[in-house]
């Protein structure tokens, strides 16, 4: 993080503001280590949780940019219009979807994705007790990650059909964003 010094940083996972340990780890680290101007994109619904906000308040380098995660579906032309207004995004199942959607609204000609590995299906297992485990490898913890239950926003374990449905939604969202990008000439 300190070597890359990103100008733009986006979070999407609600567990970052719901789970106290994750909240403290992320926001305290951002506040302590961000010594350059950075725009931090945070979903509007994160504003309901006030506990992370004081952690960032003392760092003038961090500019909060609030984005709308209202899931938009329908006729592509209507979706494009809503995306351009910033009133919503394709269903934001993962951080890539709002990142791409917001990136398309910024003055970039091209968006390059790095570390966006989606080999999810081979990473799913179901135990004899019908508990779904997923080995969610991220580029920053590939050697340390282990198979674990998938935690939903309500902090309960997700069922297999829910996980597979969310994968479907994510992949569909990528195609919606591709059509939007083509419409923008990007």
Predicted regions mapped to residue ranges:
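Metal-ion/cofactor- or nucleotide/acyl-coenzyme-handling active-site neighborhoods
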Residues: 1-186
């Amino acid at each position: 993080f300190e070597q890359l010094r990103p100008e733009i940083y986006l979070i999407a996972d609600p567990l970052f503001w719901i789970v106290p340990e994750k909240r403290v780890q992320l926001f305290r680290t951002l506040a302590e280590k961000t010594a350059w101007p950075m725009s931090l994109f945070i979903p509007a619904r994160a504003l309901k949780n006030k506990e992370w906000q004081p952690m960032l308040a003392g760092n003038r380098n961090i500019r909060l940019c609030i984005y709308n995660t209202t899931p938009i579906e329908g006729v592509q032309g209507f979706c494009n219009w809503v995306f351009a207004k910033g009133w919503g995004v394709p269903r934001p199942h993962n951080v890539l979807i709002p990142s791409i959607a917001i990136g398309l609204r910024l003055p970039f000609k091209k968006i390059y994705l790095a570390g966006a590995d989606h080999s999810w299906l081979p990473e799913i297992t179901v135990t004899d007790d019908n508990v779904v485990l997923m080995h969610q490898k991220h580029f920053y913890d590939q050697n340390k990650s282990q198979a674990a239950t998938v935690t939903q926003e309500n902090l309960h374990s997700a069922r297999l059909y829910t996980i597979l449905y969310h994968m479907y939604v994510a992949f569909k969202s990528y195609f919606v964003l591709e059509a939007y990008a083509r419409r923008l000439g990007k």
